[in-house]
């Protein structure tokens, strides 16, 4: 009898927890942070929140490979936040460029074929891409900055000629 009471009591507690846990209204996908972000980017240029592939088609940015980032302004030090955002944007640019070059290199017909007959790039190719991109990243420059209410947005770019130079050093066809 005691075991039955314990089971019923235990099941009741579990059921109550499930009911309480599920009683919250479903989230709409719009949180305070999303609202705050929309407010912070209200009136910002297209490159701040727009698709970078579309931004790259603007005449102003057509000759560069782009990266962007943001940083919260701390202690009203916009310069520090700009430097932080620029460093993040360069890191994003490097990661995107490495990924693009690896994908392009995989598509090159001159690459090695693995045991299953698929083209693949070797670890040395990946390492070489990383080294070349890191070496040329110093040539990237800040193209634009937008200072919002509480954060700084930065757009950086690397000239296509430098990207072509990296492609050439990898033995790839120019795009």
UniProtKB/Swiss-Prot annotation:
Lipid attachment site numbers (S-diacylglycerol cysteine): 22
Subcellular location: Cell outer membrane
InterPro entries membership: Lipo_LPP20, LPP20-like_dom
Keyword GTP-binding: no
Keywords: Cell outer membrane, Lipoprotein, Membrane, Palmitate, Signal
GO CC terms: cell outer membrane
Lipid attachment site numbers (N-palmitoyl cysteine): 22
Membrane topology category: Lipid-anchor
Domain of life: Bacteria
Predominant location: membrane
Annotated signal sequence range: 1-21
Membrane-spanning residues: none
Coiled coil: none
Function: Could play a role in the pathogenesis of H.pylori by serving as an inflammatory mediator.
Protein name: LPP20 lipoprotein
